[in-house]
Amino acid sequence: HIPAVAVGTDYTCIPFWEETNLDYYVIPHEDLIPEYVKRGVSEEKLLPYGIPVRQDFCRNLSKEAARKKLHLPMDVPMFLVMSGSMGFGKLAVFAAELALRCRNGEHIVIICGNNAKIERILRKEFHFNKRVHIIGYTNHVSLFMDACDVIYTKPGGLTSTESLVKNIPIVHTAPIPGCETANLQFFAARHLSVSSKHLAKQVQLGKALIENDSLREQMSEAQRRERKPEAAMQIVSLLERLVSHE
């Protein structure tokens, strides 16, 4: 018998998992157990360890230290916009709207990922705006999260979990229907993020978070209650135990 473990990376029962017969299923949260059981996965096999993230997301650098490393200005509010590896829809329009509404000295960091086309468009659009920082592909996402005050991201399971573990206030943009919809609903129901499908409202929600310390702290407190930074280590320990028993 070769041990087999599945790791869920969305906050819902992964489609077709009930048709598998593995040793264990690592799921993002204990509140999802009833959904998995209803779909036919045995409760004894469900381990709510959380979604694993790289260890650098489990360590927090001070805002000042992170900004110094990234050569970002110190004493200004700062938004982080994650495009996703392929870019979330209408990013150029969103960035223009956010920049237009940032009238109190806020800075915006936009990480374009692998989307070279959107990176070119944004660099051209904001060439003369020194408060908008366009970043292409980077291995320093954790550092940028440390440096910024609020993050905009689509509700993918991994980036949402990285943001949750990092304890940075989240504004979720419109989901791709399916698992991302479930992720958004899970986060919103527990006050781990705010969201809107409307671009102008997304901007407004981020502005409210960055301007209101109390709102930001309420979300941060909810995130501290729900995050599971030890997920990766627990999964590794589980795999080591399973292999050693073979």
Please identify what each model-predicted range represents.
Residues 63-65, 72-148, 181:
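Donor-nucleotide binding loops and adjacent catalytic segments primarily
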Residues 142, 160-166, 185:
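Short alpha-helical segment that forms part of, or immediately flanks, the ligand-binding pocket
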Residues 148-149, 167-169:
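A short alpha->beta transition loop at the rim of the catalytic pocket in nucleotide-sugar-dependent
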Residues 146-156:
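Acidic donor-binding loop of glycosyltransferase active sites
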Residues 23-85, 114-117:
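A nucleotide-sugar donor-handling region in carbohydrate enzymes
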Residues 228-246:
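C-terminal alpha-helical cap of glycosyltransferases
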Residues 188-214:
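C-terminal "capping" alpha-helix adjacent to the active site of nucleotide-linked donor transferases
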Residues 215-229:
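A short, well-ordered alpha-helix in the C-terminal region of glycosyltransferases
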